[in-house]
């Protein structure tokens, strides 16, 4: 078989979707070409950039049921967001639950926080690569502050039932 004799089928869409939708390409192109640095002046391009950012914050706040658009923060990428959230949320003495399915972008900051006194429980996956919600619930302690887990594993392709975990964490007053 030679190159070109077959078409590629791309399966790793959990984090790194290869083909971006046309709307994403168009929005990035517009952002690169219009050059309206938000918050850097009072000319029309700057004001339009500021409106676009605020409108995006408003839509995200609505989608995530946040208190206000000002609660929405943009970062350079998901890894940066995870580091900010994990390191900003956890303190020595806190307990956090995660799963064996997590990506290094989650595990590395959790291990770093563990070295600083955060207690970490890693829920094991079964032979099919699934984590039991009952096992997560059994790991909850009075000092459990959060459950941090992926929705879709880029290793197994399995989805985690985040609706059930969300309901459980609400019941216990734990962040998710």
Predicted regions and their residues:
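Pyridoxal 5′-phosphate
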Residues: 1-176
């Amino acid at each position: 078989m030679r190159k070109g004799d077959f078409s590629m089928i791309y399966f790793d869409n959990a984090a790194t979707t290869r083909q971006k939708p046309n709307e994403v390409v168009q929005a990035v192109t517009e952002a690169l070409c219009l050059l309206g640095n938000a918050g850097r002046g009072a000319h029309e391009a700057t004001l339009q950039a500021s409106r676009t950012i605020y409108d995006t914050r408003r839509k995200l706040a609505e989608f995530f049921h946040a208190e206000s658009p000002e609660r929405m923060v943009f970062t350079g990428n998901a890894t940066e967001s995870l580091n900010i959230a994990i390191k900003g949320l956890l303190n020595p003495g806190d307990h956090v639950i995660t799963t064996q399915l997590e990506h290094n972008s989650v595990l590395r900051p959790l291990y770093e926080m563990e070295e600083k006194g955060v207690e970490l429980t890693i829920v094991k996956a079964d032979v099919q690569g699934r984590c039991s919600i009952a096992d997560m619930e059994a790991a909850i302690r009075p000092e459990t502050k959060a459950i941090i887990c992926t929705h879709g594993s880029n290793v197994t392709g399995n989805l985690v039932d985040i609706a059930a975990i969300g309901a459980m964490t609400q019941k216990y007053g734990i962040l998710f």
